[in-house]
Amino acid sequence: MNPEVIITNMKKRYSGVSGTINALLPVQAKTLSIGFVGTDLPGAQLAQTNHPERFSYLSVWQAIWISRKRLPNGQPRIWHVRRDPEMMLTIFLRDVLRFPIKIVFTSAAKHRHSWFPRWLISKMDGVISTTPEAASFVPNTTRVVPHGISLERFSPPEDKLTIWRRTGLPGKYGIGTFGRVRPDKGMDIFVEAMIQLLPEFPDYTAVIAGLCTPQFAGFQKQLEQKIAAAGLSERIVFLGVIDADTVADWYQNVLITVACPRYEPFGLTPLEGMACGCAVVASDTGAFRTIVDEGKTGYVVPTDSGEELAKAIRQLMDATLAIAMGKQGRERVAAQFTVDTEAGGIAAVYASVWQD
């Protein structure tokens, strides 16, 4: 195996970056020879199963060893990296050890990087920004390529009205938020809105799906105490970590997906919810204003406002309206935000880097 592109995922915990790599690998392996380095992902396993002739797992040392030489056609091998340590490694290989490689980096941050990441990014051969705003902070952006998701993996259930029954939780309908349990993800804002709304809407139960690290155990405990004081412990439920293979089931289960972080570089949760037929309420950060078609697929509200979040969610607690918006959301994702479209944009960047 002599991969054209080496894709890295050198972080142990599953994150938003991991999620984008996970979605892309099976699609990219259809047309590219890929070597995958780092923490395993379901998408990597699928890519190897479906395209064993074009996909291989590599250790870091194996990837370094094969990168000493050019590809058989004389082209340099591309390393596609997404994190600072990965940029540092590849710059060392290319500029110090003089390996014949090219480096592509994906940037999603919607703020000016500090001096060291700026320097690292300036050394890239190609830079992909996920939004025009992210590109405005990276002068050497090669192309803007929005993230996309798999319509096969994220799909609506046969009956959104009755699917909640399979959860065994109270009520007829679900409202879900997906992400790590910590302040920057706005989980306290979500809980505030649910405490305000759920007593008025007995048919609804809220779920919070995501990892809580020991650092934020106290934060979750405070939220649980607030929920208990409101008498809602059975109707605002912490699910904990949801396996990447089954997270789509929970998007199917809920009628409304809420994404209310205080800051997000891009944010996949509204896309994943919309693809599963959910109406969406999102805070005004990340790419959410681009993703959500206001009033048609959901609503975007000011960041850090539980009151505004509750107002928007209240409008969607009409199941008929929420289902209609969810259908439009699925159509919007299919038209603009598929992983196939993202993979095509990335392939175009690879091609331009090889031509330089």
Predicted features, each with a name:
Residues 166-185, 191-195, 207:
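Conserved donor-binding/catalytic core segment of Leloir-type glycosyltransferases
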Residues 294-295, 299-306, 314-320:
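Conserved acidic donor-binding segment of nucleotide-sugar-dependent glycosyltransferases
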Residues 279-283:
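Short hydrophobic beta-strand element within catalytic cores of glycosyltransferases
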Residues 321-336, 342-345:
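A short, well-ordered alpha-helix in the C-terminal region of glycosyltransferases
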Residues 262:
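Aromatic "clamp/platform" in nucleotide-sugar-dependent glycosyltransferases that forms part
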Residues 121-160, 169-170:
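Donor nucleotide-sugar binding/catalytic pocket of nucleotide-sugar-dependent glycosyltransferases
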